């Protein structure tokens, strides 16, 4: 179990945690990943891994959509007690609020779907772990609350909660 927790910590870090929260019935705009993640972003969060002390995280991101419509998101991740690292997302919109893509931390495809101001992403990781990530967009479209859960054999081994802000 300790190895799975350590792997979760090292493999992902840059998103968030917790159980999914219901979207509020506010005037928040729909979550369109290729719009929100375009430009520079800054994320601050707390990573909780079973049998470990919670660790702070800081993620800087730069995203842009290519002519082919694929969102390229490059991230620099700093986690308390670990060396900094980089990772890349490539997300392709499929239409009707659905997405597919890749992540350097994932061991298989990333899939996603939106419902109103929420984006749900899910993907497998090494060691038989599964990730579910929910991002909820604020009413002004400038901030997303990121809640991420990592499970192994159906048991939660790590969670991350992060606030992501657009800075350009």
Regions found by a protein language model. Give the residues of each.
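Bacterial N-terminal signal peptides that target proteins for export
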Residues: 1-6
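C-terminal motif of bacterial Sec signal peptides marking the signal peptidase cleavage site
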Residues: 12-15
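Central antiparallel beta-sheet cores of small beta-barrel/beta-sandwich binding domains
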Residues: 44-126, 131-134
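A short, Trp-centered hydrophobic/proline-enriched beta-strand micro-motif
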Residues: 37-45, 146
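Edge beta-strand at a domain terminus
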Residues: 135-143, 147-168
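Bacterial signal peptide processing site
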Residues: 17-20
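N-terminal helix-cap/turn-to-beta initiation motif at the start of protein domains
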Residues: 24-40, 139
